[in-house]
Amino acid sequence: HIESGMLTPAEFAAAVIPHGTTTMFTDPHEIANVLGLSGVKMMHDEAMMQPINIFTQMPSCAPSAPGLETTGFEIGPEEVAEAMKWPGIVGLGEMMNYPGVINSDPKMLSEMAETMHANKTVGGHYASPDRGIPFHAYVAGGASDDHEGVAEDDAIARVRQGMRSMMRLGSAWYDVESQITAVTEKGLDPRNFILCTDDCHSGTLVNDGHMNRVVRHAIDCGCDPLIALQMATINTACHFGMERELGSITPGRRADFIVTSSIDDLPIDAVFARGECVAENGKLLAKCPHYEWPKAVRETVNLGKKLEPNDFVISAPAGLTSIKAKVIGVIENQAPTKALEFDLPVEQGKVRVEGDVCYLSLVERHRGTGAVV
């Protein structure tokens, strides 16, 4: 997700090319939330202008959790069908509304049907620990991959159901080490596994790297370097049906490759894309053209009012000295969370946090309602 870096495709490309990235498969669902199909098209158009390959998966879920959130625009089967006609669209982005798939929501099923009719890949997102009948139903709906696994059993379960297991190392998610043992210890066929990032903040890209960071981490976790590279290159190309164009250094494929002095440490000495040297010794050599973004798309935060300190005060019922609060429990370096309850003090009618409990607010920014939750 390019937007997680708070960057445009051009600036994201400029950040990752020196780290050896020559192809990306992206899902711009954040821009879809804000600008709908037109925003996705602008992101896609800028992506297609870059000196490396940036392919787009059409976002599937805007909103991702219908009934629980509001978005500036909504995506449906009509938008998906339209996007499938664009050059460079490789499939449907992660199907986050997994309850909708499990319960045969017509909208979700139609989006996947439009994608499969175009002979393209349906991305998965099964963020539930239940690997029983609901999981089987989700896979039967059409999702062909998933990156929400956090344990070895998750990776094995996905591969057993015919999916490709995407193991991620992003800025906040560290799920490779806990899953790669499915290959290194259990001996599953590495062709069914893909290394990915999911979300990377710009600081991670600058200071730590991109896919080179993920490959190095996999090697550090005991993976054979060649298999780690396989899971970051040809496996991905095969998954998206592009192995005849890229993913290997072979005749007829795009001349995308890196030059490195060590396959174990993977220093990126030079980067070639489409036969041209685009980076050398950490320095970007290629130009990354920018799309001419209209002024209107730069002014999409519509709060409807000026925010005041009192908007973020949590009031308690009169007479209470403490209150039982619902708290989101963070699991370090994982996407799943825990549903917790804490007794928090009330002072002068206001709930106070203590210890490592923090306030959390949601400000509606699309429709100018002024709502702060």
Predicted segments, located by residue:
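Active-site beta-loop-alpha junctions enriched in small/polar residues
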Residues: 1-3, 29-31, 59-64, 94-98, ...
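Structural motif
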Residues: 5-7, 27, 57, 125, ...
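Divalent-metal coordination cores built from histidine and acidic residues
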Residues: 10-121, 185-188
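Divalent metal-coordination and catalytic microenvironments
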Residues: 20, 43, 92, 158, ...
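Short beta-strand segments
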Residues: 57-59, 196, 361-363
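Histidine/acidic residue-rich metal-binding segments in metalloenzymes
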Residues: 74-94, 100-167, 174-195, 206-227, ...
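Active-site microenvironment of metallo-dependent hydrolases
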Residues: 206-222, 226-373
